[in-house]
């Protein structure tokens, strides 16, 4: 054994045999590196100094002269970026609206525009012909390429209650949710005469509430319905007065079974924004908040329904983008206003779903993700992220500056409250900031920041570390406090510090450079660059698990005498540790063989290599085997006995 390495080692067989001490050579003590430098500050995400939607949601009304303009209606303001593309004939919520004068605000008389782009008086003026032409052309192309299966999905998402439709985003929990909510739909097939007859869902949308006798799930249904307060898209539609795509171009092919759903009153049937999208995203995001174990999947389902409005030929991409933006604002405002109801609904939802799935808190997450992609179309988180990004922009190129810093709306951190219960409100705001969409896309650069929020990406944790990022997880609280995964590719110059007793798994191609310190809990590497490009320092109460498919690389590695390192070796390079600089390690080293890998006696198993190796493990445990260490100045392996 090299004089560069001193081992006081216990090589244990996990079948119950008594371990035998194996002692290495003594060597002079090595100066132990210090933790990565403390940046001395934490990141922040202040709200813009503008009237906040959550403080003004009650102004999202039509038929009230007090709330009929851009300045006085919060819903209209959320999507005011549309005014750079299209100027309505009148800047009032007045399409088909009459309202008396009130409190000094002038009476509202109905707009005289026809709602038809080719019939005077038209409802507005095109200011950006390139973007608006692309907006409608997208629908032409989509509807002409539409498959029969897509047409069927678009029909159901149009005619069914949105609260019912989006519940299939629950995956393996869908049946339990619908049973508990007592949800029903009367539209289980597309009738043969649907091309001439308008069918209306006579089901109950979100289900049966507490007042109707649903003791097990009524609070959940009540809360979902409560989230629709002040959520109407009609004020926005009647302000912007922008036509549906099939009125702009006859080349748009509405799903034949939805032709009877076309409104014969174009003057009051604006396309911008999509009401179906706004309601679906609001319902889906609320359900995601109540069951964060399916958070990303539920938000993805809401966005899918929005895209199906384009597939149907009923809406354009900008209509759907605007609907998503209003949904985020309304959900934030109502979660804030009805927070106590939300917490009660959260508790009831879990109790009911645990009972109906015969699970416990410790097994519920696994059950919620037990179905393969063939049975759960939202099972692939990578695909969810890609689809969300596509559905946020629908192929539009930026038309404004690309590098404006993100702004997080006031109160928006509540959207992630149950998804990241171990993060502070400020930290959740920073998560939203660091995962936001780049600036410059049509209508999405609103003053508050609703348009750029990428909620699907935010559900995967930070996108960037700036300054100190201290995460404290209490495993005793269960759920995400006990174990969580961050999948984003994290950049920045900040430092990550893990505290507490929970397990945090990092799986992105991370580039953060400020280093990583594990003061408590378990930090797991699920990718080769999980720990960024800085130093990794493990304190006496800390534990690191290397469980990536390829060797994990760090700049330097230090572990104190009571620390623990686990290597999950798969025989294909996974589970190994590569340190570009010095490795100074104490504590316990646990080696496991995973994914069916079963080495044989006599095999030499590489574990780690470093620029320089100074390992002082108090014991090495090789699960299922007896072994002895084989080391050099830069490498450590074990030979199975």
Positions of PLM-derived features:
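Extracellular beta-strand/loop-rich repeat segments of large surface/secreted proteins
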Residues: 496, 525-603
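Sec/Tat signal peptide C-region and signal peptidase I cleavage site
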Residues: 20-24
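Bacterial N-terminal signal peptides that target proteins for export
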Residues: 1-9
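Bacterial N-terminal signal peptides
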Residues: 8-19
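Extracellular repeat-rich scaffold modules on cell surfaces
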Residues: 463-533
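Extracellular/surface-exposed low-complexity segments
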Residues: 338-402, 437-490, 590-641
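Hydrophobic alpha-helical bundle signature of multipass membrane enzymes
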Residues: 25-311, 387-459
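Alpha-helical transmembrane segments that form the membrane-embedded catalytic/substrate-binding core
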Residues: 276-280, 311-339
């Amino acid at each position: 054994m090299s004089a560069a390495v001193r081992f006081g080692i216990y090589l244990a067989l996990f079948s119950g045999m008594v371990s035998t001490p194996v002692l290495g050579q003594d060597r002079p003590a090595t100066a132990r590196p210090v933790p990565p430098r403390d940046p001395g500050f934490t990141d922040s995400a202040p709200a813009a100094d503008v009237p906040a939607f959550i403080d003004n949601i009650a102004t999202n009304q039509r038929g009230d002269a007090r709330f009929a303009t851009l300045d006085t209606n919060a819903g209209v303001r959320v999507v005011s970026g549309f005014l750079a593309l299209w100027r309505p004939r009148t800047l009032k919520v007045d399409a088909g609206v009459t309202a008396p004068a009130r409190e000094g605000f002038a009476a509202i008389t109905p707009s005289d525009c026809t709602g038809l782009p080719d019939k005077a008086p038209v409802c507005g003026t095109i200011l950006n012909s390139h973007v608006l032409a692309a907006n409608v052309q997208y629908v032409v192309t989509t509807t002409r390429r539409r498959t029969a299966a897509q047409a069927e999905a678009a029909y159901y998402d149009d005619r069914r209650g949105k609260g019912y439709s989006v519940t299939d985003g629950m995956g393996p929990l869908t049946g339990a949710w619908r049973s508990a909510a007592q949800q029903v739909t009367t539209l289980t097939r597309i009738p043969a005469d649907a091309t001439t007859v308008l069918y209306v869902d006579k089901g109950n949308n979100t289900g049966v509430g507490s007042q109707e006798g649903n003791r097990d799930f009524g609070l959940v249904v009540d809360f979902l319905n409560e989230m629709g307060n002040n959520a109407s898209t009609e004020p926005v539609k009647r302000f912007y007065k922008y036509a549906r795509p099939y009125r702009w171009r006859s080349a748009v092919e509405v799903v034949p079974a939805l032709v009877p759903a076309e409104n014969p009153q174009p003057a009051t049937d604006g396309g911008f924004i999509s009401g179906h999208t706004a309601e679906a995203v609001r319902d889906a995001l609320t359900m995601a908040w109540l069951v964060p174990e399916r958070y990303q999947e539920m938000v993805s389902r809401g966005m899918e329904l929005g895209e199906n409005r384009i597939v149907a030929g009923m809406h354009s991409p900008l209509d759907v983008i605007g609907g998503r933006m209003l949904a985020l604002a309304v959900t934030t405002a109502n979660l804030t206003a009805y927070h106590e109801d939300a917490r009660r609904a959260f508790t009831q939802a879990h109790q009911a779903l645990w009972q109906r799935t015969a699970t416990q808190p410790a097994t519920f997450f696994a059950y919620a993700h037990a179905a393969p992609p063939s049975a759960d179309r939202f099972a692939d988180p990578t695909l969810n992220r890609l689809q969300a990004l596509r559905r946020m922009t629908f192929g539009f190129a930026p038309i404004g500056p690309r590098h404006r810093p993100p702004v997080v709306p006031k109160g928006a951190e509540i959207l992630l409250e149950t998804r990241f219960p171990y993060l502070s409100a400020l930290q959740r705001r920073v998560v939203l900031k660091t995962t936001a969409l780049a600036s410059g896309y049509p209508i999405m650069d609103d003053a508050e920041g609703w348009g750029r929020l990428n909620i699907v990406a935010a559900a995967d944790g930070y996108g960037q570390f700036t300054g100190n990022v201290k995460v404290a997880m209490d495993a005793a609280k269960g759920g995400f406090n006990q174990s969580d995964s961050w999948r984003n590719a994290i950049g920045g110059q900040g430092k990550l510090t893990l505290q507490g007793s929970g397990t945090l798994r990092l799986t992105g191609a991370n580039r953060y450079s400020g280093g990583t310190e594990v003061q408590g809990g378990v930090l797991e590497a699920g990718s080769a660059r999980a720990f960024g490009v800085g130093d990794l320092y493990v304190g006496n109460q800390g534990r690191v698990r290397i469980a990536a498919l390829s060797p994990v690389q760090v700049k330097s590695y230090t572990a104190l005498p009571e620390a623990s390192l686990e290597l999950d070796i798969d025989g294909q390079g996974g589970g190994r540790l590569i340190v570009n600089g010095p490795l100074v390690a104490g504590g316990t080293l646990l080696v496991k063989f995973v994914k069916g890998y079963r080495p044989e006696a006599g095999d030499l198993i590489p574990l780690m290599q470093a620029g320089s190796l100074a390992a002082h493990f108090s014991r090495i445990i090789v699960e299922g085997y007896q072994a002895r260490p084989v080391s050099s100045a830069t490498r450590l392996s074990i030979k199975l006995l």
